[in-house]
């Protein structure tokens, strides 16, 4: 269950073409000429790591990839919190356990929802609901659990990566916060 960047954009183009067609059919031939806003629903789980050149390091791994069993089990024990196979933190830790060479080059990690948002607004953010598909959220801070972030960083410290978990995750936003504007 992996997809290329090209497949993502092809899928979005198909969705927009379908939207245009439906509007034309439903509203007596009216064509969409411009949009004031648009919403895109996408997966809140999965694994999309990018390097400092903003290039994807491995094909997009969806929430349907179930090769993260060991990582999910170990993280659930470490965090004393159930970490599902599909969460981004499970995918990241499984890549570490597998000694995947790309991990050392990660500068940004997101989900499909975060990737599409970043590409259409330039902002590396996630709404709090989608962010909870990456790592548990602390309801007191409305941010990733600082305790779990610290435990994860300590767990992988022997690997000596040049990043900390908090530095590679999208910023968490609550409902109503400005998440950016569509780029031209």
Name the predicted role of every residue range.
Residues 50, 79-184:
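Gly/Ser/Thr-rich active-site cleft segment
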Residues 1, 76-81:
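Short glycine/proline- and acidic residue-enriched helix-loop micro-motifs
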Residues 23, 27, 75-76, 95, ...:
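Hydrophobic alpha-helix position signal
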Residues 1-58, 73, 105, 162-171:
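N-terminal glycine/serine-rich phosphate-binding loop of ATP-dependent small-molecule kinases
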Residues 61-62:
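Residue-level structural signal for beta-strand termini and adjacent loop
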Residues 70:
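Glycine-rich loop(s) and the adjacent beta-strand/alpha-helix scaffold that form part
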Residues 65:
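Carbohydrate-associated surface elements
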């Amino acid at each position: 269950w992996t997809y290329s960047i090209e497949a993502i954009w092809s899928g979005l183009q198909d969705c927009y073409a379908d939207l245009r067609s439906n509007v034309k059919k439903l509203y007596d031939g009216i064509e969409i000429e411009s949009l004031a806003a648009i919403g895109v629903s996408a997966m809140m789980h999965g694994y999309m790591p990018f390097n400092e050149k903003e290039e994807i390091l491995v094909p997009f791994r969806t929430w349907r990839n179930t090769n993260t069993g060991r990582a999910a089990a170990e993280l659930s024990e470490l965090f004393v919190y159930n970490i599902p196979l599909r969460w981004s933190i499970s995918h990241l830790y499984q890549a570490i356990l597998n000694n995947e060479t790309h991990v050392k080059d990660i500068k940004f990690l997101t989900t499909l929802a975060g990737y599409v948002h970043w590409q259409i607004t330039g902002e590396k953010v996630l709404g709090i609901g989608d962010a909870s598909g990456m790592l548990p959220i602390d309801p007191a801070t409305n941010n990733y659990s600082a305790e779990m972030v610290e435990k994860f960083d300590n767990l992988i410290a022997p690997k000596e990566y040049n990043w900390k978990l908090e530095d590679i995750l999208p910023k968490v936003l609550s409902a109503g916060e400005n998440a950016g504007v569509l780029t031209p």
